[in-house]
């Protein structure tokens, strides 16, 4: 069966692994997932990520491995993560109307003509785009 929303699958895997206090989470690799992981690392929500060759483990293609981040007393760095624009209902935002997550404490991941950006980066560049997810 084909996957209709790989971004939602990625976010769900990260959310579930974080709630279960796993150290890392493995998922199929794609360029957009890599860019989302890069943004999550830049914003301090995950500790690191890397791409493994799945053919060594008997799989096909590459896998993305995300190492989750916790505080000194195992507090989760990701309190919540939510998919906004879905295949059935796309959500777009203009540069003048970019969303703020929890009054600026969280981050919105936006797909723009300049690539994937956070809401703050898109505001500085003056570009809008498709609002993929909120992370707080």
Swiss-Prot record:
Coiled-coil intervals, chain numbering: none
InterPro entries attached to this UniProt entry: Ribosomal_uS8, Ribosomal_uS8_sf
Gene transcribed to yield this protein: rpsH
The keyword Metal-binding appears for this protein: no
Residue ranges crossing the lipid bilayer per the database entry: none
Subunit structure as annotated in this protein's UniProt entry: Part of the 30S ribosomal subunit. Contacts proteins S5 and S12.
Domain of life: Bacteria
SUPFAM superfamilies: Ribosomal protein S8 (SSF56047)
HAMAP family in alphabetical order: Ribosomal_uS8_B
Family: Belongs to the universal ribosomal protein uS8 family.
Cited Pfam families: Ribosomal_S8 (PF00410)
GO BP, one annotated term: translation
GO annotation, cellular component aspect: ribonucleoprotein complex; ribosome
Disulfide bond sites: none
Keyword annotations: Ribonucleoprotein, Ribosomal protein, RNA-binding, rRNA-binding
Protein name (database record): Small ribosomal subunit protein uS8
């Amino acid at each position: 069966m084909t996957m209709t929303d790989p971004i939602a699958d990625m976010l769900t895997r990260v959310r579930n692994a974080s709630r279960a206090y796993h150290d890392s989470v493995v998922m199929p690799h794609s360029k957009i997932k890599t860019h989302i992981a890069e943004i999550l690392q830049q914003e301090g929500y995950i500790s690191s990520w890397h791409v493994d060759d799945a053919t060594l483990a008997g799989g096909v293609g590459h896998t993305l491995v995300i190492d989750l981040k916790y505080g000194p007393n195992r507090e989760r760095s990701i309190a919540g993560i939510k998919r906004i624009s879905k295949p059935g209902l796309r959500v777009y935002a203009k540069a003048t109307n970019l969303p703020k997550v929890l009054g600026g404490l969280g981050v919105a991941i936006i797909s723009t003509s300049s690539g994937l950006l956070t809401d703050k980066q898109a505001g500085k560049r003056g570009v809008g785009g498709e609002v993929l997810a909120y992370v707080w």
